Amino acid sequence: MKTVIQDTADVYFKRKSDGKLVFTAEAQTASFSQAISEEKLRGGIGNKPLYILKSEKEINLTVKNAFFDLEWLAMTQGETIQEETKVKVFDREHGLIVDDTNKVTLKGKPVSDVTFYNKKGLTYKIAVSTDGTYTIPTAFAAAKDKLTAVYQIEKVGRRLAIKASKFSERYEVEYRTIAYNPDTEEVYSDIYIQFPNVSPSGEFEMSLENGNALAPEIKFEALADTDTDEMAVVIEASRDENTAAPVEDTTGSTQSSDLGGTTE
């Protein structure tokens, strides 16, 4: 059946070890490519080509998403995201004005030593104060001077560890896109492409750049199922069995758009 596919795909990732499911409906691209090893068998006078030896079939998947999702990075690491975890992160305060007693007060709550920067770029490090007020040496900054403070604070968030000894696990992957009837331009069927046994690539890049949205990309390599020998399955499922199928020309003739007639 001839149809038109013009969209990307929804993508489902299911971890084989525990069934954890990751889903995206914001994929920018969902592709797969096949490559095989081909070698010519030659013989006879002139060493002419007699046969092509085919082997080593490979299928590689690439999914690029519009949104960042920590689950994607977790897939490349073989690690589980820890929820509601206390972590220490850096914070800073700008424009802190030294008062007449040569003190400054921080709004945040440091959990580590505080480092102050003056207008000359010099630094002054001091232990955490219980009341948030810090006395600044007059040799470092005078009254009315502006300082910047850098320190660590405690937050609660989702934590993903990247360990040297852990690697990605096996997944099942399914693409789902839609196909259109070229005669009516209505949605005719759903196209499913299933990969029952894939391994995510450990390669992952996060490039943070001004003005450009981070579009994470993850790659997989399909492996053969040990029972069925299948690496992938493509399924076309009609949305409605009563939906009119695209009209196919079985006469071998072509219609003339200029004359409205038939040209043999």
From Swiss-Prot:
Swiss-Prot/TrEMBL keywords: Host-virus interaction, Viral genome ejection through host cell envelope, Viral penetration into host cytoplasm, Viral tail protein, Viral tail tube protein, Virion, Virus entry into host cell
| Compartment annotation | Virion
Record-level GO cellular component terms: virus tail, tube
GO BP annotations listed: symbiont entry into host cell
Taking the first listed entry, what is the main subcellular location of this protein, grouped into a coarse class? Answer: virion
Region: Disordered; residue ranges are 237-264
Regions of compositional bias (Polar residues) in chain numbering:
250-264
Q: Coiled-coil intervals in this record?
A: none
> What is known about its subunit structure?
Interacts (via N-terminus) as a monomer with Bacillus subtilis defense protein DSR2 (via C-terminus) in a 4:4 DSR2-Tube assembly; this interaction induces a conformation change of the tube protein and activates the NADase activity of DSR2 and leads to an abortive infection.
Q: What is this protein called?
A: Tail tube protein
Q: Where are the residues of the annotated region Interaction with Bacillus subtilis DSR2?
A: 1-76
Highest taxon, organism lineage: Viruses
In chain numbering, the residues marked as site (Binding to the host DSR2) are: 13, 23, 72-73, 173, 200, 218
